Amino acid sequence: MNTNQVTAVAFLVAGAIGTARAQQATFSSRIDAVRVDVLVTDANGPIRDLGRSDFEIRDNGVLQQIDLVSFEQIPLNVVLALDMSDSVAGDRLDRLRAAGTAILGGLQSGDQAALVTFSHVVRLAAKLSPDIRSVRTALARASGDGSTSLVDGAFMGMQVGASDAGRELLIVFSDGLDTASWLSADKVLDVAKRSDAVAYAVAVRSRAKPEFLRDLASFTGGRLFEVEKTERLDSVFLQILQEFRQRYLISYTPRDVMKEGWHKLDVRVKRGGTVKARPGYQS
């Protein structure tokens, strides 16, 4: 078995353990409380003055009592999961580094960040930490080579950002299709349904459709950005951060619903507006 295979196998074993722990923790938290990040917009942009009485949330069709609606600047756990395959080189790599540096520069006191890179292997380049400088240094040292383990990279990103404190924002960038992952897309999407992370995906537009990234963003209440080129990648990353900070955090304790299985969520605003939130969660 070569070095790359050993690395991949070790990652899978560690990932399987991490998944079991994450699912167990998520299941227990679902019994106590469910947290839902919600973006509400109108023709003028995000609506910022809503309170608890303005929202309705249904869990599997059952109207729930909302315990808390917060629009505070709750600290963020931001994980960058970046494609470093051999197609990300030269100017494209420089622009990706600049975009990552821009979003790290937009973080505030109390926020944490981490960096995951993926090519033919997945690397935790910088663990989740309030030391943003160390993440910036790891980003500056990152380089591209090999094929693309997109699904594996997204999986590790969700594991790295999981925390009882802070709101979890996962940003996944890729310029191509997955060619080297060991984990299946369905498996990782199932983990996403159990996660509190909101995933935003950035894909370079090509003939191949980024279905995995689209599903990942959809299941977590995030958004997919498809870009023609990478010249303005930094503005896209900053737009993601700004949009995420405009979200409300809704918390409720499920009542009169089955605790196991898929829970369909329906979030509405009584006074109007377009609502974006995860479609449900798996417990």
Where does each model-flagged region fall?
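Positively charged n-region of N-terminal signal peptides that target proteins for export
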Residues: M1-V6
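Bacterial N-terminal signal peptides
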Residues: T7-A16
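Small side chains
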Residues: G15-G18, A113
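Scaffold/interface architecture of coatomer-like assemblies
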Residues: A22-S283
